[in-house]
Each structure stands twice: as C-alpha cells, then as structure tokens.
C-alpha cells in the first residue's frame, strides 16, 4: 500500500512541476489537397502527407473524448491525419501494449508504469478523475455506517489493481486506520466488475468514469471518491519513444488538437451538446453502458486544462 501511495504522490509532484513551468472516421476536408493553416479549424498547418495516428484510447473515459470528438468533427482529417484506436479499459494493459499505439491518455499509475518499464514519455496533464469512486450495496453494513473501520475488515472489494482505483480505495482504508492487509482485493476490469458486483460477487466495488455513474444510477451507494477524499489523482498524455523520435511532427499536432478540441467544446452550448452526443456514441462503440445524462455529468467534471490558460 505504501509503495503504491508513494508512487502516485511522486507522480503528482512531477505533474506540479510540469504545470509550473480501428478507425472511427470523421468529416472535414473531402479534397485530397492539404489545406493551408488559415483554412483549418485551429489554424494549424497540415502534415504534407497523409499520416496515421494510433491512439491508446481509454474506453468510456471523459479524458479520452477530445480524441474522439476531434476525429468525428474532422479536426484531424483537415490536418491530413487518419486516426486509428487501440482501446483499453485500464492503464496496465495499455502500457503492456504500448508498441501498438503512438499517443495515449492514462492515469498516474499507468504513466508511472509506462515511464519505468516501457520508455513512455509524458507530454502533459489531462484530468484529475474526480469520479473514481467506491460503491457498496444499499442494504450493506458499509452503507449504514461507512466510517466504522470494524465493518470493513475482511470484506472483498472488486477493482482493477495497479490503477487509480486501487490508490483511491487504499487511501480510504488509510483514512479509517486500515490497510490492504485488512481486506481482500479481487482484480477485475471495471465493466465486468460492475456486472459481477450486480450479480452478487464481492462486498464493495471501485469503478470510474461512465461506469461509476452507471453504478450510481443503478442504485449502488457511493461511499467516497477522489473528489471527496481530496487526493491528487492526476492523469496524463503520453507518447511512445518511437513516436517521439520518428513521428515528432505528428505527435506535436496530436497533443495540440487534443487540448484545442476541449477548448472548442466549451466555446458554446451547441459545441458541448455535440461533445455529449459523441461521448454517448463512443461509449456505444466501446460497449460501455451510458446515456446522455451520464456523459454530460462526466464532461461537467472533466478537469482538463485549457491550452490558453497561463501556467502558474
């Protein structure tokens, strides 16, 4: 537990220092001729030749949506970029498969794992994943008396290990004077974890993003989350060493489009409505249960920086 907590806190410190200083298709340019910078949505200069960007895509996550929105709105197409996706529902698997993508968005443990073991290079921050949450059943002892450490001892909690969900759960246990030794943790990705929990497995459940809102809407009780705990749960953009060395122009455009797309989403109610609609579409494509309400709530709390914001 101490090792995981210290790793995440170390990552948070790095991020503070940084701050201080298959294809989905989309609209856009129907011509084979590259546009001039003045003709593109964000005033960026298109690549001279058609190039493919492969994204490590976090299924159902709000911090992956700028990629999908940019793709579907044609922002990549007009820059002579085709987009392909390698989809994941957890950071560890994404890092293990890093040879299959160029750029990704992922939580702190994934970034740390990637930097340590896979030569992944961090590019910037993209969220604090406030909706990383712990749930129990409404008729459980934990729902009735959530701050009583005695009733947490010996429980089984279902979550994907090596992720921000484990970090959040261990932080909550620590606040009760407990540790991982006092419980049983069953490793399972979030989508099957919710299904298993609803089928009666386990005593507690940790899930994030659209899956967390789905759990809440189905009647499960939210005990705590990253926002309530007040812990640093930063997520980041990262690229592979190969992409940084051999596709630097592509990676530069990719991260700029990512941040500029989030700015675009917030420029008008119509833009945000399109973003929500595309979020729902993405979840449907990825097999993540969602609806307009879930996706709107997830985007409402997305703590993604504006590219125009001054650093502090």
Where in this protein do the model-derived segments appear?
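Short, glycine-/small- and polar/acidic-enriched structural segments
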Residues: 32-179, 184-187, 203-209, 222-226, ...
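Short helix- or helix-capping micro-motifs
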Residues: 215
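Short, hydrophobic alpha-helical packing/hinge segments within bilobed ligand-binding/sensory domains
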Residues: 91-97, 192-196, 211-212, 298
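Short glycine- and hydrophobic/aromatic-rich loop-to-beta-strand nucleating segment
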Residues: 133-135, 236-239, 243-244
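Flexible, active-site-proximal loop/turn residues at the rims of small-molecule/cofactor binding pockets
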Residues: 27, 110, 211, 243, ...
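Secondary-structure end/capping motifs
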Residues: 245-308, 312
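Short, low-complexity disordered leader/linker segments with a strong preference
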Residues: 1-52
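Active-site-proximal catalytic alpha-helix in oxidoreductases
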Residues: 233-240, 255-259
């Amino acid at each position: 537990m101490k090792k995981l907590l210290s790793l995440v806190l170390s990552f948070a410190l790095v991020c503070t220092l940084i701050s201080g200083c298959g294809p989905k298709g989309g609209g856009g340019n129907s011509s084979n001729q590259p546009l001039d910078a003045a003709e593109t949505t964000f005033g960026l200069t298109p690549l001279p030749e058609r190039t493919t960007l492969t994204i490590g895509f976090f299924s159902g996550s709000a911090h992956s949506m700028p990629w999908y929105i940019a793709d579907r709105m044609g922002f990549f197409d007009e820059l002579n970029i085709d987009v392909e996706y390698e989809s994941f529902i957890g950071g560890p698997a994404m890092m293990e498969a890093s040879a299959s993508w160029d750029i990704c968005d992922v939580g702190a443990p994934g970034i740390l794992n990637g930097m340590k073991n896979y030569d992944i290079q961090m590019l910037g921050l993209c969220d604090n994943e406030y909706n990383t949450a712990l749930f129990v059943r409404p008729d459980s002892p934990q729902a009735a008396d959530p701050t009583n450490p005695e009733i947490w001892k010996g429980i089984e909690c279902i979550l994907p290990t090596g992720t921000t969900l484990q970090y959040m759960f261990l932080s909550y246990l620590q606040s009760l004077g407990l540790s991982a030794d006092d419980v049983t943790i069953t490793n399972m990705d979030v989508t099957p974890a919710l299904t298993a929990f609803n089928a009666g497995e386990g005593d507690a459940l940790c899930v994030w993003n659209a899956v967390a809102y789905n759990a809440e809407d189905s009647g499960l009780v939210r005990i705590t989350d990253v926002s309530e705990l007040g812990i640093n749960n930063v997520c980041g953009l990262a690229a592979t060493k190969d992409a940084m060395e051999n596709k630097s122009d592509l990676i530069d455009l990719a991260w700029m489009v990512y941040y500029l797309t989030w700015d675009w989403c917030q420029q008008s109610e119509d833009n945000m409505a399109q973003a929500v609609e595309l979020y729902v579409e993405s979840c449907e494509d990825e097999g993540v249960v969602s609806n307009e309400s879930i996706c709107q709530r997830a985007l409402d709390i997305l703590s993604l920086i504006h590219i125009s914001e001054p650093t502090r």
